[in-house]
Amino acid sequence: MDVILLERIEKLGHIGDVVAVKNGYARNFLLPRKKALRANEANRKIFEANRAQIEADNAARRTDAEKESEVVNGLTVTLIRQASNTGHLYGSVSARDLADAIVEAKPEAKVAKNQIVLDRPIKSIGISEVRVVLHPEVAVKIKVNVARSPEEAELQAEGVDVMNQMFERDGASFTEDYDPNAEPGLATEAEEAVADADDNAETNSEESL
C-alpha cells in the first residue's frame, strides 16, 4: 500500500514522503495512529492544503521533545527485582516498567511506554542501555540498573560485575585443599598403605572363618 507520511518514520521516510508499505503495517499501525494517509488523489490534495500546519505542529512537538531530552538523556534508573542465583529474572523488565521508573525519577518527564525501544528483553540483572524516542526526530539513551537489592545496585553502579564476582566466590569454595609443603607422592603412598591394610584385614577375616 502507498501512504503519505505525516511525520518522520525511522527507516521509512519524512513528512510528505510517499512510500510503499505492507498492508498490515499501514492498517494496524500507520493509519490508526495518524502517522500516514492513504496515498490517493483526494488525500494528496488534503495533505498539500494542510502541509504548512502539519510541519508547524511537528516543529512545536520537536521543540518540546528537545527540552524533555535535557531531563531524560543519560538518566540512570534502578529496578529491584527477584532473580535466581544465576542472575536470571523471574519475569522480564517491560517498557511500562521503564516508563514508570523514568517518571518516578523525573516527574517532569512525560514518557510513555510506546516511547521505550527495547532491542531485546531485559531478563537478567546488570546494567543495560535503552533508547527512548521522545519524538520521531529526537531520541535519547538511558541506563537501566537491574539488581536484587539496593546494595547490589550500588555495586553495579560502581562498575562491579556482581555475577562474575559471585561465580568466582562460589568456585573458590569448591577448590580442593592441599598442603603446598607436602612432598610429591606422599599422599598417594599413604592412600596405598591404607588400601593394603584394608585388604589384609579382609584376608585375615576370611581365613578365620
From Swiss-Prot:
* Residue ranges, annotated region (Disordered): 169-209
Bias (Acidic residues) occurs at 189-209
Q: Which GO terms describe its cellular component?
A: ribonucleoprotein complex; ribosome
Q: Which GO terms describe its molecular function?
A: rRNA binding; structural constituent of ribosome
- Kindly indicate whether the keyword RNA-binding belongs to this entry: yes
Tell me which domain of life the UniProt entry assigns to the organism this sequence originates from: Bacteria
An individual GO BP term: translation
Alphabetized SUPFAM superfamilies for the sequence: L9 N-domain-like, Ribosomal protein L9 C-domain
Q: Which UniProt keywords apply?
A: Ribonucleoprotein, Ribosomal protein, RNA-binding, rRNA-binding
Family listed = Belongs to the bacterial ribosomal protein bL9 family.
This molecule's function is given as: Binds to the 23S rRNA.
This protein's name: Large ribosomal subunit protein bL9
Source species: Zymomonas mobilis subsp. mobilis (strain ATCC 31821 / ZM4 / CP4)
Q: What gene name is listed for this protein?
A: rplI
